[in-house]
């Protein structure tokens, strides 16, 4: 597993997006925990998967405080801005292939239930969540959607493709859609193909009832690798947070961590 401690380079990218640390008021009182210290704890929880209440006092920030910052920054759109910033850096350095998009999903247990959960048909109906992931041709994560584990893959394709980000980093107008989209048999439907063609995207979706030798797996494998990278962030293996806003924050931060490691060529 890669380091559970936040690199200084990540803090440098994140710091301009953070709100300024508030000074102690005129009446005194306890100093507010610095944002970068809270960010270090959030990174640690994401990578190790520990519970908020198990955060050590020696880290300089309680788990409760870090949880509040995680939610507050998600509501302010900060995690989304971080993800876009890292995508821009990858695009600037020629590490994105936005001509191709690949879609796949993975199921995550959610023992405590919560928003966007449902019975997992592959796990005896236990409560779970489905993460639908969109990546570029190199496997860089572009978007994640969270639904109940029993949600149909067919119905997720339109929504996830509409979340294709407008990445800057190079001269010219940002690309609005990829040229081609790849998906497995779970997304096979004529309506999905018509929708993609309407957007100007060439669909490459494996058809149900056909042999597994279409050759599409030579391209689709990148999304399966990215799903494995996300599961390497232990907080993403099991969903413990019931609120949608917290899960969305984890999704965007996890994508940002993967993007950062690809950009700086760190172990993923």
Regions found by a protein language model. Give the residues of each.
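Short alpha-helical elements
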Residues: 1-268
């Amino acid at each position: 597993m890669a380091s559970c401690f936040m690199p200084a380079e990540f803090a440098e990218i994140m710091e301009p997006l953070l709100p300024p640390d508030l000074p102690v008021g005129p009446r005194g009182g306890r100093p507010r925990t610095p944002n970068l210290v809270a960010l270090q704890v959030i990174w640690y929880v994401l990578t190790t998967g520990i519970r908020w209440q198990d955060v050590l006092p020696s880290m300089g920030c309680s788990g409760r405080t870090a949880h509040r910052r995680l939610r507050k920054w998600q509501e302010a759109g900060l995690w989304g801005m971080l993800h876009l910033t890292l995508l821009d850096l990858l695009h600037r350095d020629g590490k994105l292939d936005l001509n191709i998009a690949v879609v796949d999903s993975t199921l995550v247990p959610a023992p405590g239930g919560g928003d966007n959960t449902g019975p997992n048909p592959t796990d005896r109906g236990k409560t779970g969540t489905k993460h639908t992931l969109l990546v570029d041709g190199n496997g860089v994560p572009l978007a994640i959607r969270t639904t109940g584990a029993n949600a149909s893959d067919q119905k997720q394709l339109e929504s996830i493709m509409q979340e294709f980000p407008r990445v800057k980093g190079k001269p010219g107008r940002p690309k609005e859609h990829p040229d081609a989209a790849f998906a497995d048999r779970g997304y096979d439907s004529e309506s999905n193909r018509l929708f993609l063609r309407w957007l100007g995207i060439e669909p490459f979706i494996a058809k149900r009832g056909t042999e597994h030798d279409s050759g599409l797996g030579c391209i689709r494998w990148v999304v399966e690798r990215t799903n494995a990278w996300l599961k390497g962030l232990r907080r993403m293996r099991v969903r413990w947070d019931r609120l949608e806003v917290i899960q969305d924050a984890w999704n965007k931060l996890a994508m940002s961590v993967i993007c950062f490691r690809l950009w700086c060529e760190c172990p993923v």
